[in-house]
Each structure stands twice: as C-alpha cells, then as structure tokens.
Amino acid sequence: MKVRYFGTDGIRGVFGDTLTDELAFKVGKALGEIVGEGKVLIGKDTRVSGDSLEAALAAGLTSMGVDVLSCGILPTPAVALLTRITRSYGVVISASHNPPEYNGIKVLKNGYKIPDELEEEIERRMEGEFQRRYVVGKIKSFREGKDMYIGAVLEMFKDLDLSGKSVSLDLANGATTTTAKDVFEFLGAEVEVFNSSQDGLLINQGCGATHPKFLAEEMKRGRIGFSFDGDGDRVIAVDEERNVVNGDKIIGILAEGMMEEGRLRESVVVGTIMTNGGLEEYLRKRGIELVRTKVGDKYVLEEMLKSGANLGGERSGHIIILDRSTTGDGLITALELMRVVERLKKNLSDLAKEIPDLPQITRNVRRTEKTSLENGRLRELIERYSAEGYRIVVRPSGTEPVVRITVEGKDRNRVEEIAEELSRILEG
C-alpha cells in the first residue's frame, strides 16, 4: 500500500515516533530534486525538536545542491510572506496547535501552501532512488526575515493608530513571541503579554488559541485580547467584557466591516463544513453568501481563489484575508479586527453579540482498527437526526489519530445527548 505522509496541513506526527530526522532528511532530498539549484527558506516554532528536524531537512536540501536560508523562530505566515517576496520555496517546522511532543513539516511556494499534486510528487520521490548531485548547497542565516515581515505588516496597517488602546496577547509560548508584541507596540498600543516563553516544552500548554479561556480569565476588563496558536496562523479574540470571540464571529465582524468599506469581493465568504449555522444566517441577512468546503485552510484558500472571494476561514481561528495575505495570519487578522472595530465605532462585545452562535459540540473518538465510519447504526442515526434539523459532521482528523463528531442545533441539551450517543456507537 502506498505510504501517505502529508495530511491536511503538511506532515504531522510525534517526534521520534511517526516523525523522525530520517523522514525530514528524505523530505529535504525530495524537495531538493524538485527545486534544483535554487534556495529554500526554513522557519520553525519553539518546539525542542525543531532544531533537530531543521538540521536533517537542511542536510537533505543542501545534499541536492539547494541553498538553505535559516529564518529561526518565525510564524508560518511570516515564512509564507517571505517566500512570496523572494519568489522561492519555504518549509515551516511546526505542529501548529498540537502539544509539544508533536512536530510537523509544511512546504510553501511563492506565498502559498503547495497543492496536493506537489505533495504527492514529493512522496513519490521519497519512496524512490534519489538523483546524485555533485554540487552542495550552503546554509545561511536569514534572521533579517523577521524584520522584513514586521515591516510588511506595518506597511499594510500604516493607517491604524492604536494609541490609547490596551491590548492583551497570549502568545502560546510559540512563534508569535518574535513578532506580535513588537507590531502592536509600533502601532501605539499598550501591550500586556502572557505565555511568551520560547521554552519548546510549553508551547500550547493550557494556553493560546486552543485554550482562549486562559486569556479571558487572566486579562483585565476593558482590554481587547488575542490568543494565537503555536505557529501564529490562528487567532481567537477576547472582548472587553472578557468573552471569547471565536473564528466564526471574527469572520462575521470582518465581513461586516469589509462590506461597508467596499472591500468584500463577490459578496461571498468561504467557510467549512464546521462553520456555525449562526454565522451563515447572519451573513445571509446581509446579502452575503457562505460557501462551505472541507476542513482545512488550504481548501478554504482553493475555494477563495476559485470564487474570487477575499475573506474566508475556520471557527478555529484560521482566517484568510486575501488582499492582505496568502495564508491564515493570526497577527494580520487581529489587526484587521482592531481596524474594523475602530472604523465601526462599536465595542467588540457589541459586534460579537450580533452574530448568533448555535449550540455546537465536538467529540473526539480515538481511532482504532475497529473504528469504522461505515457503521450502519451510525449512518441511520445521522440520517434521522439530520431530518430533525440537527447538523452532523463525522470526519477523521487530518492532524491527529482521532475521529471528530460535531453536532449542531438549537437545543443545547439535545445536541449534547446526540453527540454522546454517536460517540458511544463509534467507539464500539
């Protein structure tokens, strides 16, 4: 059976188990064959395994004659922007929102995550015999990449004055420790920071975009807060009343602001099968169509490029503003949200309350050999509850060995009961 290394967001696994230096070396050699004698940028988050994986990846690339530009700790969207500026390939060593023992490899080209076809080409080369090269590439430090990224973001928001504004940032002990605080301070904000360690054993641990309640509980009232994930491509907001503002609500607020500004293209917003029905209802009332895709920001981007939309994203906080960035960028999303709040002259809490949020529950069921999505009883119940008006999504995770069951409907108690029942059946 053909080996499949790439999932919905690059290669992902537990370091030393399903993700090894040997695998990273092979990825480097395979990518090196494709690149030829060009250059590849490498950035990483703060995980302790990042240095080891970078060394292996760089060894593979340079053995094929490719020069490596080492960016150090830098968010995924920063590396994406740098590949766009330099018109080159890039690799990010990160497992995004996953725990510290995980790591991953994401490949970028000219600002975008590579398509499935190129991932398959890398995999094919990894399983074959590598070409022999007689030219060895060089490894060079490219720490100026951070300043290039910060400069580009500040240029995008040169009309945004945050003087007198108080902002709280949860950096998840991850890659935004190198960028977010500096940018907000350059724009004039008074900044309070949580979880800014670069100790790779702390990344995403009880903090960041997957644990936004940490910031909601720790920050003072009257501030606006932003919780980033480990590699900086997600953000969840916290309003001045310390309520969590999820990705769906952020998308709704941005859509409202961009529409009033005349910036929302095609009157379309792209979401996923996980996007809350409350957002869909909110957008519909404003003449905006929600188009759904499979889960994964790369599928959101594909649909955006196809439909001409410039706003899309996921409830998890992966949000793409295509006239700002070619990928999800938590920092750019946070600044755009601040800009919209200022422009509409409303509190973030008031804007968030305008967007209904239907009760939605997700249960994770560990995948085993017995786990089957073709379970007859499971399919029967999904059909029955769907007919009763509940929206049900059952899908394997693309980044973890679990199956996610999501149930959405107007009755929270019933939603919980249905999610629990379906989980028990799937567990066998």
Curated annotation (Swiss-Prot):
PROSITE patterns linked: PGM_PMM
Modified residues (Phosphoserine): 96
CC per GO annotation: cytosol
Cystine pairs: none
Keyword Ligase among record annotations: no
Any GO BP annotation: carbohydrate metabolic process
Record-linked InterPro entries: A-D-PHexomutase_a/b/a-I, A-D-PHexomutase_a/b/a-I/II/III, A-D-PHexomutase_a/b/a-II, A-D-PHexomutase_a/b/a-III, A-D-PHexomutase_C, A-D-PHexomutase_C_sf, A-D-PHexomutase_CS, Alpha-D-phosphohexomutase_SF
Post-translational modification remark: Activated by phosphorylation.
Cofactor stoichiometry and binding remark: Binds 1 Mg(2+) ion per subunit.
Pfam family, one: PGM_PMM_III
Key words, A-Z: Isomerase, Magnesium, Metal-binding, Phosphoprotein
Annotated residues for binding of Mg(2+): 96, 229, 231, 233
EC number(s) from the headed UniProt entry: 5.4.2.10
Reactions catalysed, as given in the entry: alpha-D-glucosamine 1-phosphate = D-glucosamine 6-phosphate
Active-site residues (renumbered): 96 (phosphoserine intermediate)
Swiss-Prot/TrEMBL cofactor(s): Mg(2+)
Enzyme kind, highest EC tier: isomerase
Gene Ontology molecular function terms on file: magnesium ion binding; phosphoglucosamine mutase activity; phosphomannomutase activity
Biological function: Catalyzes the conversion of glucosamine-6-phosphate to glucosamine-1-phosphate.
Protein family per UniProt: Belongs to the phosphohexose mutase family.
Protein name as it appears in the record: Phosphoglucosamine mutase
